[in-house]
Amino acid sequence: FIPYLEHSIELGRSFIQPRYQGKRSLDYLWYGIGAYLYQHPEIRYLIGPISLSTSWPEPAQKVIASFYTTLFGNHKTLVDPRLPFDFELIQEFAPFKQVADEENYKQAYAILKALMDDFGVKVPILYKQYVELCQPGGCEFLGFNIDPSFSNCVDALILVHINTIKEKKHQRYIESHATVFQKRDSA
């Protein structure tokens, strides 16, 4: 895991006030991250936790963990959670295994969404956004942990390979800063 850390930045938790949620707030966060990445091309990975609220029913948390482990799990065991979240892989996702393409992901996601509807919750937006930011294989879920210092929520630790960010998103969030920094540097 150390070789990854040498070329990584950690993305900590973000909180957006409810009155600003849904109004491009996550988009603005991505622009900020992209500006930093533009200035630091030596960074190759984003690493950080994504939390599941403790207000969620535990069975829904287990389905989320199963889905993201089945389709996006890193099977090299780069990390060992201190307090592992206990869950089993569920059969609904078994046919999909590692995501091979967008269509495969869409089919699996439709199943996940239906299961979440049964629990009365929605798939957390950051889980969806990180996965959809990258080409298949570019976002890896390294493990699920219970975080006692954060209300015992369930955290997924993710590893994003920056070189797999989809072209449109790379242009929007990272390359869009080229003119800003060129103007600043020439002033």
Predicted regions and their residues:
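Metal-dependent phosphoester-hydrolase catalytic domains
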Residues: 137-143, 157
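Non-catalytic substrate-recognition and accessory regions of acyl/acetyltransferase enzymes
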Residues: 1-9, 154-187
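Active-site proximal loops enriched in glycine and acidic residues that flank catalytic Cys/His/Asp
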Residues: 50, 145, 160-162
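Short proline/glycine-enriched turn/loop segments at secondary-structure junctions
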Residues: 143-150
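Short, solvent-exposed polar/charged micro-motifs at secondary-structure junctions
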Residues: 57-59, 150-156
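Acyl-donor binding region in acyl/amide transferases
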Residues: 1-138
